[in-house]
Amino acid sequence: MQVEAHLQKIIDQDGKVHLTLIDPASQTPERAAEIALAAVEGGTDAIMIGGSTGASGTLLDETVIKIKEKVNVPTILFPGSSAGLSSYADAVFFMSLLNSRDLGYVITNQVLGAPLVYKSQIEPISMAYLVVEPGGTVGWVGDAKLIPRKKPDIAAVYALAGKYLGMHYTYLEAGSGADAPIPPEMIGAVKKVLGENKLIVGGGVRDAKTAKLCASAGADMIVTGTIVEEVKDVAAKVAEIVSAIKS
């Protein structure tokens, strides 16, 4: 399965993609698989696996394996560092945190992780990762110089730089469990310069109204993370959001 081509096909057919993010550190592999299955029943298009505190090793591998046993949608690694790689996944967001002050998150982790990606034949999907205020845990761990919420032009030039460096995707991140999502004005400004390149938006997307606002502003893909770990009926919550962004 070529994951990037698969996601493009969904965009061509449905207009938008929904991604569910599962952090292996937040629950057992078995529970992660149950959440993934419920999300797929709700209409999610792919499962992202990872977290900013860097789940790795056996826990990560077992989580990926259990999820793949339950669902047939793509599994995409979302690593917090080079340790967040698993040869069992279908693809990896091979990303650079462009607004980090720490070179480790800009390039060093990528250098360390590249050989494993090469040897295991995981599909790399190049991505510029941009952390916006408030930033949450990822902003702190990644030592990001947070992009101000009221400065969409700064986000746009970062995204443009990522595009010119050859990255296919740009991810605007407000931080896991953020009180507010990425502002629509920022999403629109970034999508304008990206053109055909794909824009992912995540952080603070907790309901259908917010998801639709982000999608209408220009996001090609919407990520739902924290909320699927909190609600009792994951399938219903995901279905509500998927319906909003694809209608």
Curated annotation (Swiss-Prot):
Keywords: Cytoplasm, Lipid biosynthesis, Lipid metabolism, Magnesium, Metal-binding, Phospholipid biosynthesis, Phospholipid metabolism, Transferase. Mg(2+) binds at D23, S52. GO terms for molecular function: imidazoleglycerol-phosphate synthase activity; magnesium ion binding; phosphoglycerol geranylgeranyltransferase activity. NCBIfam families: GGGP, GGGP-family, PRK04169.1-2. It comes from the Archaea. Its cofactor is Mg(2+). One of its GO terms (cellular component) is cytoplasm. Its EC number is 2.5.1.41. Sn-glycerol 1-phosphate binds at Y171, L172, E173, A174, G175, S176, G177, G203, G204, G225, T226. GO terms for biological process: glycerophospholipid biosynthetic process. It comes from Methanosarcina acetivorans (strain ATCC 35395 / DSM 2834 / JCM 12185 / C2A). This is Geranylgeranylglyceryl phosphate synthase. It catalyses: sn-glycerol 1-phosphate + (2E,6E,10E)-geranylgeranyl diphosphate = sn-3-O-(geranylgeranyl)glycerol 1-phosphate + diphosphate. Pfam families: PcrB. It is found in: Cytoplasm. Transmembrane segments: none annotated. Its main location: cytoplasm. Prenyltransferase that catalyzes the transfer of the geranylgeranyl moiety of geranylgeranyl diphosphate (GGPP) to the C3 hydroxyl of sn-glycerol-1-phosphate (G1P). This reaction is the first ether-bond-formation step in the biosynthesis of archaeal membrane lipids. Belongs to the GGGP/HepGP synthase family. Group II subfamily. Pathway: Membrane lipid metabolism; glycerophospholipid metabolism.
